[in-house]
Amino acid sequence: MLSSPVNLPKWLEENSHLLKPPINNYCVYNDDFTVMIVGGPNARTDYHINQTPEWFYQYKGAMMLKVVDDGNFRDIIIREGEMFLLPGNTPHNPVRFADTVGIVLEQKRPADTIDRMRWYCQNCKEIVHEASFHCTDLGTQIKAAVEAFKGNEQLRTCKKCGVLADWSPKPGSIQDPNVQ
């Protein structure tokens, strides 16, 4: 049986409490496609690598999508009303700010695909740690990987330069495009 359409403003009014850290998302549909409503703020330093594309739409406010594009670290600002299609296998860190809401659409993962969570050294940009898993429940699996990294200084120590990687961004280290 088909479900009813979602009235997004009404849904947010009634359910915004469901958008909780560290991922701040709620899965609205989870069949051939996963549709998530995502709120801010969040505070993560990991880069997610999904083998399939991800579609981002910013319903309220702007977000920053930190990416590694052909080996270069850069920030993509997705403003209110804008959408962006991220190609598969692109390391990305979605940064969401207070009072922002977006929609993310992902394909259901084929059985042979592996998602990865990668942390880079803020000093030398080497990979500090990588966790991998077949994604069946994005919210719980990403949260578990983030919590494991947060709680283990050995995982967070760069083997190249010895710097302890941050598990969350330092206050003030990310410019909020909503206040410029």
From Swiss-Prot:
Q: What class of enzyme is it?
A: oxidoreductase
Annotated binding of substrate, by residue: E54, R96, E106
Q: Which CDD domains match?
A: cupin_HAO
Q: Which reaction does it catalyse?
A: 3-hydroxyanthranilate + O2 = (2Z,4Z)-2-amino-3-carboxymuconate 6-semialdehyde
Residues binding O2 are R44
**One GO term describing the cellular component:** cytoplasm
Cross-referenced InterPro entries: 3hydroanth_dOase, RmlC-like_jellyroll, RmlC_Cupin_sf
Location in the cell reads:
Cytoplasm
Query: Could you say which residues bind a divalent metal cation here?
Result: C121, C124, C158, C161
Fetch the SUPFAM superfamilies from UniProt.
RmlC-like cupins
What's a single GO BP term from this record? Answer: 'de novo' NAD biosynthetic process from L-tryptophan
Binding of Fe cation occurs at: H48, E54, H92
The record's annotation in Pfam families points to:
3-HAO
Q: In which pathway does it act?
A: Cofactor biosynthesis; NAD(+) biosynthesis; quinolinate from L-kynurenine: step 3/3
Q: Offer an example of a GO molecular function term for this protein.
A: 3-hydroxyanthranilate 3,4-dioxygenase activity
What EC number is given for this enzyme? 1.13.11.6
Sorted keywords for this record are: Cytoplasm, Dioxygenase, Iron, Metal-binding, Oxidoreductase, Pyridine nucleotide biosynthesis
Q: What family does this chain come from, according to its entry?
A: Belongs to the 3-HAO family.
Question: NCBIfam families given for it?
Answer: anthran_nbaC (TIGR03037)
Instruction: Give the protein's function.
Output: Catalyzes the oxidative ring opening of 3-hydroxyanthranilate to 2-amino-3-carboxymuconate semialdehyde, which spontaneously cyclizes to quinolinate.
The name of this protein is: 3-hydroxyanthranilate 3,4-dioxygenase
Provenance organism: Neurospora crassa (strain ATCC 24698 / 74-OR23-1A / CBS 708.71 / DSM 1257 / FGSC 987)
